[in-house]
C-alpha cells in the first residue's frame, strides 16, 4: 500500500449539484452509462473535459480514466467503482493533479452519482465530487487557489449536461 493510501485524508472541498430529468429513475442505468460514456460525449459535458475512456484491468476491475482542466489545474483521474448500482455509482480515484499545470500532487477524488425519484415520471440526477488530501498544507493551497470555487463551477456546468446525455443515450438506445 502506498504511503498516501495509508494516511488520513482531509477534505479539501466537496460540491453537490442536481439536475432534473423528465423520466423515472428506473429507466436508467448509471453504471452502464458512465462506463460506456464515449470520449466525444465526455468532452461535450464541460469546457474543461479533455478526454475520457474506460478499461478493464487484468484482475477484472473496471476503470474510468478522465482528463480535465479545472480552474487552470490539470487532473488525470483513474476511477474505480466502489458501488455499481443502476441508480447509484460511487467511484474513487487517486488522481494526478498539476497545480497551475506545474506542481504535481496526488489527491483522492470521490465521484458519486445518484438518481433520486421525484415522482412516478421524474427524477433528478445528483452529482457529488469530494476532493481530499492527507496534508493540511494542501487545504491552505487549495483555498488560496480558489479550488473549491472552480470545482463547484465545473460541477454546476457538467451536472445538467451529464443528465441530458444520460437521458438522450438511454432513450435513443431504447427506440
Predicted segment positions?
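Short, surface-exposed coil-to-beta transition loops
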Residues: 14-16, 74-78, 106-112
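Beta-strand/loop substructures that line and gate deep hydrophobic ligand-binding cavities in soluble
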Residues: 98-157
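Short, highly charged C-terminal tails/helix-capping segments
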Residues: 160-175
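Hydrophobic ligand-binding cavity/cleft-lining segments
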Residues: 1-63
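A short, structured loop/turn motif at beta-sheet edges
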Residues: 23-28, 82-88, 114-124
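Residues at beta-strand starts and edge strands
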Residues: 11-15, 28, 61, 89, ...
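Short amphipathic alpha-helical segments
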Residues: 22-29, 33, 150-158, 162
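Glycine-rich portal/gate segments that line the openings of hydrophobic small-molecule binding cavities
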Residues: 50-102, 169
